[in-house]
Design a protein with these regions (language model features):
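Conserved catalytic core of the tyrosine transesterase superfamily
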Residues: 1-258
């Protein structure tokens, strides 16, 4: 329970006591709510995203018993980075959800109980095609229905993706702790940071092409599976990774006087 929740409940209790005549006025009427912290998500630049994916590729073990496992984890993170997916979405994909002729993925029953069909960047579709060829050569006619298989007939585990992500982030020197400076929370890199980064970097590219990011926002929202484009706008607290890094450095070097 948050401090603000306690204040709200206590204020309501004393309002009741005032109505019953036990108090003349509410003793906590003027107690202010705490200011909510502003969260500054970690943003990867396009170059940092490329480095992260390269680091994951170099960590793929060539041993036959490990190769497909490591490649599967890489594919999951690739879809987070290049398609802005939530971490649960690639892990729940079935083989039949990939449509090679259309170069698209059908994402079913997402966070808001919505389905969506997304076109894939050509490079991503090529990687999926190559992955499926490797999978078939190593697993043969496997009965595992998941596009990204785990042990036996199960899907790839969320924690394996997170572990590989954090190892790669550390390997490229981008590991950062979560910091609270004043009323701003500077979040550490997480797999969800790739979704934030996808939104920020996509709109930046659109602006660089001379197009309107505002007009593109509803399309981006639909692609990312948001019910309202305002949910996507929530991700856009920074213009790019550089602006976020400059703010973090500035706030850290200019602490509030005590």
């Amino acid at each position: 329970v948050s401090v603000n929740s306690v204040i709200c409940i206590t204020r309501g209790f004393f309002n009741f006591m005032v109505r019953k005549g036990y108090y003349d006025e509410n003793p906590v009427r003027d107690v202010p709510f705490l200011r909510k912290n502003v969260v500054a998500p970690f943003i990867f630049s396009p170059q940092q995203t490329d480095r992260l994916l390269t680091a994951l590729l170099t960590r793929i073990r060539k041993k036959p018993s490990c190769y497909l496992k490591d490649l599967t984890i890489y594919m999951a993170i690739l879809l987070l980075a290049r398609c802005g997916m939530r971490i649960s979405e690639p892990l729940r994909l079935l083989v039949e959800h990939y449509r090679p002729e259309e170069k698209s993925l059908y994402i079913e029953n997402t966070k808001f109980k919505k389905d969506r069909l997304i076109p894939l960047p050509m490079a991503v579709a090529t990687e999926i095609d190559n992955y499926l060829q490797v999978r078939e050569s190593l697993l043969g006619t496997s009965q595992n229905p998941y596009l990204l298989p785990g042990f036996r007939l199960s899907r790839l585990l969320d924690q394996k993706v997170r572990d590989a992500f954090h190892q790669a982030v550390k390997a490229i020197g981008l590991a950062r702790p979560r910091q609270v400076i004043g009323n701003t929370v500077f979040a550490k890199p997480t797999p969800h940071s790739l979704r934030h980064s996808f939104a920020v970097n996509t709109l930046k590219k659109i602006k660089q092409r001379g197009k309107s990011p505002q007009h593109a926002l509803p399309v981006l929202a639909a692609y990312m599976g948001h019910v309202e484009y305002r949910s996507t706008a929530y991700y856009l607290k920074f213009l790019d990774a550089e602006q976020r890094e400059k703010l973090a450095s500035f706030v850290a070097s200019h602490p509030k006087p005590s």
